[in-house]
């Protein structure tokens, strides 16, 4: 597998709509950086968040997920309570080619503040907004800035197309829009 460079990412975004909307340069002045980088793409976090709360004494169960586990916030700055967790999604919509696997890594700016972002791989043939999981590992409240960089996606090109893509397998998170909660089918 090869890590794909900026030129390839740009071509796929502009000609195959792999990333929409696509920022063709790195934006970093006064913001957490986002946009095209040398060997990846720094995606932005949308302004809708699901902040976990214990107000309703809900139990987090991935097989029976309760919407009472969180409160919805639409804001330019999301405050993550100490040692807590927030769901969000990317501003960008991704369409992953059949011969590409995408992995996500966190932003150094957030990691240095104890904020960790987790995203599972984007499978070949998958498309949608990416649901982002932010953890505040500190004993203090922490901020996430909407419409600024959240994480970096690295595109790995396989030697050939896969036999069965995420789309072929009718993956449960296919074509997701906004924040998608856990699904066990």
Curated annotation (Swiss-Prot):
The keyword Hydrolase applies. This is dCTP deaminase. GO terms for molecular function: dCTP deaminase activity; nucleotide binding. DCTP binds at residues 107-112, 131-133, 152, 166, 176. Pathway: Pyrimidine metabolism; dUMP biosynthesis; dUMP from dCTP (dUTP route): step 1/2. Keywords: Hydrolase, Nucleotide metabolism, Nucleotide-binding. Gene3D superfamilies: 2.70.40.10. It catalyses: dCTP + H2O + H(+) = dUTP + NH4(+). The keyword ATP-binding does not apply. It comes from the Bacteria. It is an enzyme of class 3 (hydrolase). GO terms for biological process: dUMP biosynthetic process; dUTP biosynthetic process. The active site is at residue 133. Signal peptide: none annotated. Pfam families: DCD (PF22769). HAMAP family: dCTP_deaminase. InterPro entries: dCTP_deaminase (IPR011962), dUTPase-like_sf (IPR036157), dUTPase_trimeric (IPR033704). Belongs to the dCTP deaminase family. Its EC number is 3.5.4.13. Catalyzes the deamination of dCTP to dUTP. Homotrimer. The lineage of its organism: Bacteria, Pseudomonadati, Pseudomonadota, Alphaproteobacteria, Rickettsiales. The gene is dcd.
